[in-house]
């Protein structure tokens, strides 16, 4: 397989919709364009997982991605885990499609011999390490997220460090919603790393339309 570019949207929210378009419908359109949409819902202490679970799961399902509900102290490791799991899921999907083309539509990774399956998984792991990755981070900056944004910023730095340990190239971009003048506003344009994230921290504040 040729090394390609995986495109992801990472939505970080409190799981309660604001103004604007239906997020599930937008996720569906993105997925149809080949972009995986992952969603992380951040809970307030004392709030049950079930209260924000439905919307978060629905958006991720429509976007063909992964979803997790966490408290803010677990956000950093969850951001990294979800991003990497989504990469693995997408790559396995590509590999399974290639196998179907070669071996027939009924064939899948589980249908081949253990030895061949091990070889296939080696290919998946290699592609995870070498493929190019573009992640557009979409951060909910509604008033309810005010006490979580500092943790979000730290998590994005950790994500950049983690992904840049791979040999494949990475590009990141950060948008916020709701914006002050529009539903969605760009905070940080495409860059290979987020180590200079502090430069746009002042823009990533709660509040908006």
Indicate residue ranges for each PLM-predicted region.
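Surface-exposed acidic, glycine-flexible loop patches that form ligand/cofactor-binding
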Residues: 1-3, 127-128, 163-166
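VWA/integrin I-like adhesion module and closely mimicked acidic/polar interface patches used
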Residues: 2-6, 13-62, 70
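Von Willebrand factor
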Residues: 8-12, 131-188
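Second-shell loop/turn segments in exported
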Residues: 16, 142, 146-148, 202-207
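Short beta-strand-loop
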Residues: 47-57, 171-203
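Short secondary-structure transition/capping segments
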Residues: 50-53, 79-84
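Short acidic-hydrophobic, aromatic-tinged amphipathic segments that line or gate anion-handling sites
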Residues: 66-75
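Acidic, polar low-complexity linker/tail segments
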Residues: 82-136, 143-148
